[in-house]
From Swiss-Prot:
This is CBL-interacting serine/threonine-protein kinase 3. Residues 155-184 are annotated as: Activation loop. The lineage of its organism: Eukaryota, Viridiplantae, Streptophyta, Embryophyta, Tracheophyta. PANTHER family: CALCIUM/CALMODULIN-DEPENDENT PROTEIN KINASE KINASE-RELATED, CBL-INTERACTING SERINE_THREONINE-PROTEIN KINASE 3. One of its GO terms (molecular function) is ATP binding. It comes from Arabidopsis thaliana. It comes from the Eukaryota.
Amino acid sequence: MNRRQQVKRRVGKYEVGRTIGEGTFAKVKFARNSETGEPVALKILDKEKVLKHKMAEQIRREIATMKLIKHPNVVQLYEVMASKTKIFIILEYVTGGELFDKIVNDGRMKEDEARRYFQQLIHAVDYCHSRGVYHRDLKPENLLLDSYGNLKISDFGLSALSQQVRDDGLLHTSCGTPNYVAPEVLNDRGYDGATADMWSCGVVLYVLLAGYLPFDDSNLMNLYKKISSGEFNCPPWLSLGAMKLITRILDPNPMTRVTPQEVFEDEWFKKDYKPPVFEERDDSNMDDIDAVFKDSEEHLVTEKREEQPAAINAFEIISMSRGLNLENLFDPEQEFKRETRITLRGGANEIIEKIEEAAKPLGFDVQKKNYKMRLENVKAGRKGNLNVATEIFQVAPSLHMVQVSKSKGDTLEFHKFYKKLSNSLEQVVWTNNEVKKETAK
């Protein structure tokens, strides 16, 4: 097998891999603890940007609080590190994808299933609120599923990355995706984080049960008006109890909007409700956080880049495949999440050309480097420009696996893009039948 050279990156004891998410202030990469082998998510912040926007103290405060929160439905924050130029937040790595993907793939949920996810969501939100931590940006991308199908809320407590506290002492935000955002947030006159989170939970519940958004319009001003009025229609298949609860939550007046405590007493919510039982540990060691924000030289971690050959072996292929089922790697019709894989025939350079030929007519700019490609849609969608990252791995001399992942933008747009891309590459897709023929030889 021809092995190409690839630069491997290391931060402290963590081996850093592919990018799995990207935002204005942060990039998230897959990483692995070299001492334990445990996979983690590594959120990388640029120190200069943090200081420029005067967010250091607020981020320090929220990270310190999040380190104390150990809730089964909240992505856990393990530790914080820093180099001379970057801040690294080590988070639990969640493997089940976004809750939104489940709706896209399977459609709306039955009430019992939706209720279970909503119960987990409300308990976690209320728990964090009770400790003074608010999300303020609850949306499908932040609602993940673990390998057991349990809800995990990500980015809880890291809202300082997109929120600003002004002189009036209230929170202010400029929101790029308003569908899940409370009316008072859109008005930008300041708002309470707890009631704003509650509204977002109501929109999430509606989407789980209906399969579509309660407030939607291609015209942004019309969308703002719909949200501000709080007028929406419930689909006829919803039970009366579900309709009543959604109506109480999607109250445009934050002063009369239902609270988590009132939701806990709601009859529809209480059905089959079992609050999670978990141990609240007192992890009060904040030395790593203090060191990061005091620029302590002795606690700075080193970033290393080392040249070494990258080969994808059988174990890696199996570990990348859901349910240890290799058929998913060779099936272009597979269900997928924020990232997916497709196996193609031909040489690596030939495959790069074919992906470029397929992406450009779809309106994407293409950047290439070291068998990796970055595709950016020049036309902004609902959530800004869709950015897609691809990386090519060699399985055999004329057989390559291409990993396709969303690094920025709307998940639904990514799903549509992937289907168009895989259709364009149909002639070179290595199908499941070919795998079986090869195996039978």
